[in-house]
Amino acid sequence: KAAIRSASYKGKLYGYPVSFSMPVMVYNKQYASTVESYEQLKQISDNYVVTEENAGVAKVFDFDPSGMFLNYPYIGRYMNIGGDEAEDAASFTIDEQHFKQAVKEYAQLKDTFGIDRQSSTLDECLDEFTQNKLLYKIVSTDNLKKIDESGVSYGIIPVPYLSEGLESVPMSVTTLAIVNPYTSNIAVAKTVARAISYDYAEDIQSLSGHTSARADLTKKGKNADNTDYNMLHDIYSDSIVKAKYVGVQNIYTQYEILIHQVWDGKSVDDAYNEFHKGVESYLTSIR
């Protein structure tokens, strides 16, 4: 579903979905197992016992709280940018009650897991995970190739929900192969687009590090079960499509400012009011 929505505009399909990026959680299969919620993750952290076998593990959970994309799943479910097809610049709705609740729960991850926004960078966390020093981490699907090549035994699961009554839904970004209607040879252009998006789709991850948007492939990881990779398309299909109109980055920037503010101690109400005011100001300017 997400692939078709990303490749369409006003009901017309404009491109061939080639690959996608979205946040997921990875876990170290040698020392950990699947989780569905951050409450489960907290229980693991609170009751973690260091043994001779796991002595090299430095942290149970860490992630980069600074970027909009990796942090969208926690709160983004409670606002709709661009309408049902993510293309209407005048459309913006927000579920204030659940949005604020999600922001509050999100900010609590800082103290629950001792995460520093300045030092917990994506690269640092990736290095720790690939060295068996970190049990759980939020990554982009674009990071899976590096993890797979590291030799660590890992699993892939959806981003956990923050607490009962809240959902975590990732944002996805789809890369398309688009045929220019004014090209001198439409047939050749379509053949190339099909080759990239379909015929050679199984080679995309090994060559580029991106995950193919073709859903019927059996994904393969050297150090993860194929079922973990195949599950990616189920998550992707129901993901939030990044809005595709010019200027929408203004809203995403406001969102990133919001998560920085609450992470750094600003009250949820004040951060929300500033966010909402900024979005409304932008929407007023384009109406």
Where are these regions (language model features)?
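Paired acidic/hydrophobic, glycine-rich loop segments that form the ligand-binding mouth/hinge
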Residues: L135-S140, G155
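Glycine-centered hinge/linker elements that transmit conformational signals in sensory
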Residues: A89-S119
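Hinge/lid segment of periplasmic solute-binding proteins
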Residues: K1-V24, E39-K42, E53, I156-P160
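Short glycine- and hydrophobic/aromatic-rich loop-to-beta-strand nucleating segment
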Residues: P23-Y27, A177-V179
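Extracytoplasmic/periplasmic substrate-recognition and gating elements
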Residues: D148-G209, I257
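Long, aromatic- and glycine/proline-rich binding clefts that accommodate carbohydrate-like moieties
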Residues: I157, Q205-Q261
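Short helix-initiation/N-cap motifs at beta->coil->alpha
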Residues: D116-T130
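Beta->alpha turn/N-cap motifs
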Residues: L122, I138-K145, T175
